[in-house]
């Protein structure tokens, strides 16, 4: 399976749940609760990635990153943003990778 294929497949399952709700589906639960619940889950899972990173447990970190990706895909779908939109933006950024940007603020000052 192509590395991008799994993300597309998951995105399509999420979209299908939105359009064809299945009783008891966690994805449907998120869509029913709306943007605040989805954003809360994205925030919670992102925090768990940070904690798992500090704990130095690769398996936990991978699991938490998968949770962030899943909830982010739900958010994208909720906002009607297609994976292709994200891919296009990443491609544009990749094309600029060798171009130096104007002075950036140091990370510690953000």
From Swiss-Prot:
Catalytic reaction(s) noted: 1-(5-phospho-beta-D-ribosyl)-ATP + H2O = 1-(5-phospho-beta-D-ribosyl)-5'-AMP + diphosphate + H(+)
Entry keyword Cytoplasm: yes
Domain of life: Bacteria
Subcellular location, principal: cytoplasm
Sorted UniProt keywords: Amino-acid biosynthesis, ATP-binding, Cytoplasm, Histidine biosynthesis, Hydrolase, Nucleotide-binding
Pathway: Amino-acid biosynthesis; L-histidine biosynthesis; L-histidine from 5-phospho-alpha-D-ribose 1-diphosphate: step 2/9
InterPro entries listed in its UniProt record: HisE, PRib-ATP_PPHydrolase-like
EC number(s) recorded for this UniProt protein: 3.6.1.31
GO biological process, one term: L-histidine biosynthetic process
Record's keyword annotation contains Ribonucleoprotein: no
HAMAP family for the chain: HisE
Family the UniProt entry places it in: Belongs to the PRA-PH family.
Record-given protein name: Phosphoribosyl-ATP pyrophosphatase
Organism: Clostridium acetobutylicum (strain ATCC 824 / DSM 792 / JCM 1419 / IAM 19013 / LMG 5710 / NBRC 13948 / NRRL B-527 / VKM B-1787 / 2291 / W)
Gene: hisE
């Amino acid at each position: 399976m192509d590395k991008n294929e799994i993300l597309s497949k998951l995105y399509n399952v999420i979209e299908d749940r939105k359009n064809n709700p299945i009783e008891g589906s966690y994805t449907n639960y998120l869509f029913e609760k709306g943007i605040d619940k989805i954003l809360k889950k994205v925030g919670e899972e992102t925090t768990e990635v940070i904690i798992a990173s500090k704990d130095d447990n690769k398996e936990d970190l991978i699991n938490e990153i998968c949770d962030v990706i899943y909830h982010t895909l739900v958010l994208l779908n909720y906002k009607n943003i297609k994976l292709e939109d994200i891919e296009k933006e990443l491609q544009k950024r990749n094309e600029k990778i060798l171009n130096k940007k104007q002075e950036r603020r140091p990370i510690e000052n953000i």
